[in-house]
Amino acid sequence: MREIVHLQTGQCGNQIGAAFWQTISGEHGLDGSGVYNGTSDLQLERMNVYFNEASGNKYVPRAVLVDLEPGTMDAVRAGPFGQLFRPDNFVFGQSGAGNNWAKGHYTEGAELVDQVLDVVRREAEGCDCLQGFQITHSLGGGTGAGMGTLLISKIREEFPDRMMATFSVMPSPKVSDTVVEPYNATLSVHQLVENSDATFCIDNEALYDICMRTLKLNNPSYGDLNHLVSAVMSGVTTCLRFPGQLNSDLRKLAVNMVPFPRLHFFMVGFAPLTSRGAHSFRAVTVPELTQQIFDPKNMMAASDFRNGRYLTCSAIYRGKVSMKEVEDQIRNVQNKNTAYFVEWIPNNVQTALCSIPPRGLKMSSTFVGNSTSIQELFKRVGDQFSAMFRRKAFLHWYTGEGMDEMEFTEAESNMNDLVSEYQQYQEASVSDAEEEYDEEAPLEGEE
């Protein structure tokens, strides 16, 4: 089977990762210690995409847990699913990266990275046919951002032909955890543009909004936010974990979603959104799900797709869903919102179906969109970056770890290029391609 090796780095990555494993263990009928007591053979059929079978009916996640300080790891180990993970797969330092990207990427993280790669190698050797890697991390901190991107590039070197998907938590406009977030995020995006095949952008502020607006939670905890993220991660990986009518794997997803290699930053959404503990008992219909996933309020990244256009998108439906109904709904959405889809990629919505719904729901759908409006997110970070970089604020923390200012300048211009590429394709139309931008067009008033 096509296995996936999962890495989680830094505090954010480990907490999201823990929520993800909790969600999919439940879907596959595993208890907190990895013992199978499920009811359906479908749960077992593709168990080994994410789990290794150990002796005695026990399943172990193919997960590598990385952090530069022991705190979060201890929390995961003490959590309800702490006994699930293989003890050797916890790799941690003692010093912490202190929200400093340079520490994670060049000094502290670089010392730990070989240890991590040994564990990754061992997990990869235990696979029949490794499909790729997925990594959960945040881009605003030191470990997840700095060391996470270091791991990605090292894994890229060693497994150049395997897929690399990242679930990256972007710094959000209003909710800021650290002052140097814009630096860390820009340096990370600089790496992700080159080394990742698919990056699912998640943003704390958008998650807060969903919690407050849709789920009616007054003061959402990180637990609630992670619950949302794990629902999306479980949805994106459904097709890999269960037999379905229309299956897709990481590579198929990427082939359908990435029209140009650098533009692989996706917005994600999930429906039906239900608050934790209050699983809705009302029936959900395909039209309702479709309407909900194409609703800007449901996007887990703080950018509004109505300000841009979709290059491609993918909708994954789970549960007892009729193919025809899905096709009709998707066609319906495209016809009503033609302005939001680029016309030079016909049929740019891909659908996948899986007959096993998530726990507690009759059906659900997950949305992955490659929209040019994601540039808002990069623009926002870029503006904050240049405001600080112009004054060289906080730079000594980075140069002190051996970084060069040049690297900041490169990262900044790479991110600006990314924004203008998105802009260029947003404005492109079918006829442009034929005319190939006539360079010598006379300026107004010159004729």
Curated annotation (Swiss-Prot):
Keywords, in A-Z order: Cytoplasm, Cytoskeleton, GTP-binding, Magnesium, Metal-binding, Microtubule, Nucleotide-binding
Binding positions (GTP): 11, 69, 138, 142-144, 204, 226
GO cellular component: cytoplasm; microtubule
Coiled coil stretches, renumbered: none
Cofactors, names only: Mg(2+)
CDD domains: beta_tubulin (cd02187)
Organism the protein comes from: Zymoseptoria tritici
GO BP annotations, alphabetical order: microtubule-based process
Protein name (Swiss-Prot/TrEMBL): Tubulin beta chain
Acidic residues composition-biased segments: 432-447
Chain spans, region Disordered: 424-447
Residues bound to Mg(2+): 69
Function: Tubulin is the major constituent of microtubules, a cylinder consisting of laterally associated linear protofilaments composed of alpha- and beta-tubulin heterodimers. Microtubules grow by the addition of GTP-tubulin dimers to the microtubule end, where a stabilizing cap forms. Below the cap, tubulin dimers are in GDP-bound state, owing to GTPase activity of alpha-tubulin.
Location of the protein in the cell: Cytoplasm, Cytoskeleton
PROSITE patterns: TUBULIN, TUBULIN_B_AUTOREG
The family this protein is said to belong to: Belongs to the tubulin family.
Principal localisation: cytoplasm
Subunit structure: Dimer of alpha and beta chains. A typical microtubule is a hollow water-filled tube with an outer diameter of 25 nm and an inner diameter of 15 nM. Alpha-beta heterodimers associate head-to-tail to form protofilaments running lengthwise along the microtubule wall with the beta-tubulin subunit facing the microtubule plus end conferring a structural polarity. Microtubules usually have 13 protofilaments but different protofilament numbers can be found in some organisms and specialized cells.
